[in-house]
Amino acid sequence: MNVRRVESISAQLEEASSTGGFLYTQNSTKRSIKERLMKLLPCSAAKTSSPAVQNSVEDELEMATVRHRPEALELLEAQSKFTKKELQILYRGFKNECPSGVVNEDTFKEIYSQFFPQGDSTTYAHFLFNAFDTDHNGAVSFEDFIKGLSILLRGTVQEKLNWAFNLYDINKDGYITKEEMLDIMKAIYDMMGKCTYPVLKEDAPRQHVETFFQKMDKNKDGVVTIDEFIESCQKDENIMRSMQLFENVI
């Protein structure tokens, strides 16, 4: 597997999901995030493609021979916040990595693990995969990828928070329980490994969850609704500042 091509997609997902998962590190500066995010879309600006290559990409998009046929480019452009040219570039990279036209969970986990060798990203990648797999068919298509990426990179704060809520709502019942949030937090800590908590206690994820629930569970009924989640996040300066990073870099 071509690591450079994998990095162009996976780094986007890692940074974006980290924001949605309220993962903060001292090194998460605007510059470092920008450098990683720019690897996917604007990378094409540094390389001048010949007309023949550009036409080839267009032909691939409209006459794909892969097992999964993508939706028409015009439809995806209308459903996302990417331009036609950006979609062409994204599809070209997606197809190079996934000739079948879809990514299954095992491949997704393999890609994700390459960026967290210091930890175990398996569980978090599972949750993230399910968030992208909106129709729950066990595969992430190019359409799934684009719609999720469009929200994470160019969506409104409301759209990003809705996406984050869906990530935490593991069983998709419309509520976040402490157990669900704890599962996500443990997965994040496991993924970051020693880089995140060399001196923290084992119960750090649980303490993190307790703090969040004190803020979010307004009526103290033991679950967090989408309204409680969004309201609490919008009042949290750290979360909102993290969201704004993406608005400034793309």
Curated annotation (Swiss-Prot):
<comment type="function">
    <text>Regulatory subunit of Kv4/D (Shal)-type voltage-gated rapidly inactivating A-type potassium channels. Modulates KCND2 channel density, inactivation kinetics and rate of recovery from inactivation in a calcium-dependent and isoform-specific manner. Modulates KCND3/Kv4.3 currents. Isoform 4 does not increase KCND2 expression at the cell membrane. Isoform 4 retains KCND3 in the endoplasmic reticulum and negatively regulates its expression at the cell membrane.</text>
</comment>
<dbReference type="GO" id="GO:0008076">
    <property type="term" value="C:voltage-gated potassium channel complex"/>
</dbReference>
<keyword id="KW-0851">Voltage-gated channel</keyword>
<dbReference type="InterPro" id="IPR018247">
    <property type="entry name" value="EF_Hand_1_Ca_BS"/>
</dbReference>
<protein>
    <recommendedName>
        <fullName>Kv channel-interacting protein 4</fullName>
    </recommendedName>
</protein>
<feature type="binding site">
    <location>
        <position position="180"/>
    </location>
    <ligand>
        <name>Ca(2+) 2</name>
    </ligand>
</feature>
<feature type="binding site">
    <location>
        <position position="171"/>
    </location>
    <ligand>
        <name>Ca(2+) 2</name>
    </ligand>
</feature>
<keyword id="KW-0597">Phosphoprotein</keyword>
<feature type="binding site">
    <location>
        <position position="169"/>
    </location>
    <ligand>
        <name>Ca(2+) 2</name>
    </ligand>
</feature>
<dbReference type="GO" id="GO:0015459">
    <property type="term" value="F:potassium channel regulator activity"/>
</dbReference>
<dbReference type="Pfam" id="PF13833">
    <property type="entry name" value="EF-hand_8"/>
</dbReference>
<feature type="binding site">
    <location>
        <position position="133"/>
    </location>
    <ligand>
        <name>Ca(2+) 1</name>
    </ligand>
</feature>
<feature type="binding site">
    <location>
        <position position="137"/>
    </location>
    <ligand>
        <name>Ca(2+) 1</name>
    </ligand>
</feature>
<dbReference type="InterPro" id="IPR011992">
    <property type="entry name" value="EF-hand-dom_pair"/>
</dbReference>
<feature type="binding site">
    <location>
        <position position="144"/>
    </location>
    <ligand>
        <name>Ca(2+) 1</name>
    </ligand>
</feature>
<feature type="binding site">
    <location>
        <position position="217"/>
    </location>
    <ligand>
        <name>Ca(2+) 3</name>
    </ligand>
</feature>
<feature type="binding site">
    <location>
        <position position="135"/>
    </location>
    <ligand>
        <name>Ca(2+) 1</name>
    </ligand>
</feature>
<dbReference type="GO" id="GO:0005267">
    <property type="term" value="F:potassium channel activity"/>
</dbReference>
<keyword id="KW-0472">Membrane</keyword>
<feature type="binding site">
    <location>
        <position position="219"/>
    </location>
    <ligand>
        <name>Ca(2+) 3</name>
    </ligand>
</feature>
<keyword id="KW-0631">Potassium channel</keyword>
<feature type="binding site">
    <location>
        <position position="228"/>
    </location>
    <ligand>
        <name>Ca(2+) 3</name>
    </ligand>
</feature>
<feature type="binding site">
    <location>
        <position position="175"/>
    </location>
    <ligand>
        <name>Ca(2+) 2</name>
    </ligand>
</feature>
<dbReference type="InterPro" id="IPR002048">
    <property type="entry name" value="EF_hand_dom"/>
</dbReference>
<dbReference type="GO" id="GO:0009966">
    <property type="term" value="P:regulation of signal transduction"/>
</dbReference>
<feature type="domain" description="EF-hand 4">
    <location>
        <begin position="204"/>
        <end position="239"/>
    </location>
</feature>
<feature type="modified residue" description="Phosphoserine">
    <location>
        <position position="17"/>
    </location>
</feature>
<keyword id="KW-0963">Cytoplasm</keyword>
<dbReference type="InterPro" id="IPR028846">
    <property type="entry name" value="Recoverin"/>
</dbReference>
<keyword id="KW-0576">Peroxisome</keyword>
<keyword id="KW-0633">Potassium transport</keyword>
<dbReference type="GO" id="GO:1901379">
    <property type="term" value="P:regulation of potassium ion transmembrane transport"/>
</dbReference>
<dbReference type="GO" id="GO:0005777">
    <property type="term" value="C:peroxisome"/>
</dbReference>
<comment type="subunit">
    <text>Component of heteromultimeric potassium channels. Identified in potassium channel complexes containing KCND1, KCND2, KCND3, KCNIP1, KCNIP2, KCNIP3, KCNIP4, DPP6 and DPP10. Interacts with KCND2. Interacts with KCND3. Interacts with the C-terminus of PSEN2 and probably PSEN1.</text>
</comment>
<keyword id="KW-0630">Potassium</keyword>
<keyword id="KW-0479">Metal-binding</keyword>
<feature type="region of interest" description="Interaction with KCND2">
    <location>
        <begin position="237"/>
        <end position="250"/>
    </location>
</feature>
<keyword id="KW-0677">Repeat</keyword>
<comment type="similarity">
    <text>Belongs to the recoverin family.</text>
</comment>
<feature type="binding site">
    <location>
        <position position="173"/>
    </location>
    <ligand>
        <name>Ca(2+) 2</name>
    </ligand>
</feature>
<keyword id="KW-0407">Ion channel</keyword>
<keyword id="KW-1003">Cell membrane</keyword>
